Amino acid sequence: MQTVSTETVPGHETVEALGIARGNTVEARNVGRDITQSIRNITGGELKAYSELLSKARDEALSRMEADAEEMGADAVVNVRLETSKVTDGGSEVIAYGTAVRLR
């Protein structure tokens, strides 16, 4: 499955748009991790635990989007976008979406 942020897949012709493929996940922070990250927030520097959490969430959302596109019979997903939103005080949603297409 090819996924690109552009309107087309280089070297391929889009023959059919199948619809919007999407995948999302909601990840919650860990209370113990929150304490250590709060200290890091005071002293400065990267909040690695949160960076890793969001990176994992992005990967999962993209994987679920690809699975959705495969169920539609797509060869690729174009115009891929990622968005995040706060769902609760301790959790964030990451959604990946794009247009599922068939290629020639």
From Swiss-Prot:
Pfam families: YbjQ_1 (PF01906). It comes from the Archaea. Disulfide bonds: none annotated. Belongs to the UPF0145 family. This is UPF0145 protein NP_2600A.
